[in-house]
Amino acid sequence: MKIKNKYVVGVHIMFYEIEMVSEYIDSCIGMIQNIENKENLTFHFTWNISEYFESIDTTKISKEQLSNLFNLQVNRLSNLDVKTIIEIKTNDDDVYNIADYRRDLNYNYCTKYDFILWGETDSLWPKETIEIVEQVEEYSKNNNISKYVLFFSERKMWDPSWQPIEHNDFTDVTFIDNNDWALNNLSSSKSYMTLEQMYEVNSKAESLDVRILTNPKFDGSCLVIKSDLIKSGVNIPQSLLCSGEDTSLADMAKLLLGDSFVQYVIKNILRVHNRRHPNKRLYISNENNPRGFCGDAKGNWWNILEQMSKHNLGTIRQQSHTYTMKDVFNKIKKG
């Protein structure tokens, strides 16, 4: 198919995520296979090998080997005559994380592309992604909707507030809050699902079940953003240090648009967010936490960073101290 709109698909990849990259690239290849005018597509990557918080375990792998693995995967897209942009972050740069990346992606590319797509290393794009966005955009134009986000559905989540974005096949499942069920049952949003398994779920959809939400409910993995939303001033606040960048975007969108906010949810097309991917955090010195559990499993630095970031998020509309990365490092040093 020939597409009318221009797309940038961006992902921030930390060195410890390298063993998940091939699956992410597989999903990117899957969603562009039927696109004739691939010049309308750009894939943006930031490869982050900085070690401000996590150090590379060089007894297992070197920086050069990590970068070679990264380039090998990105070249799979480049070899399909798709434009790829790579930026690299090291300790020569300031601290840079997914919140910085997504803020910059939004700001730098909203005037160059019609849609900004947030990828995530542990997530998988539906192969129908571009085709669906094109269809929804046609509907939006006909109904004078120019600022919106689009989100594919999720498997069973851990609390009822997520039900509006759960896939039709999973919404009636009971979430069991223990690791035995949550990490192993394919209905659970915390379990590992392959690209082929996602494709199988999506193959059942004979027509699209599209819902419209006026209150935002999404996370940052496989989020589709109409650039007009960013142009109008919606973005991740600079005060957001790391954790909660997706929530902050949702909050700012609702704050600016109010009752005019629009989120499309494709209730019968699944995208996968493998939150507890078995290879989520590898090659980190003095850490054995491959599934990426938060809290003490990551280290006290994470608790400090998360706490300060969430404080900033929760006090955006209040008179309150705004923490900075300097505050984070000072508290880490104090122990």
Q: What are these regions, as identified by a protein language model?
A:
Residues 23-40, 52:
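Short, acidic, metal-binding catalytic loop of nucleotide-sugar glycosyltransferases
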Residues 106, 126-237:
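Conserved catalytic core of nucleotide-sugar-dependent glycosyltransferases
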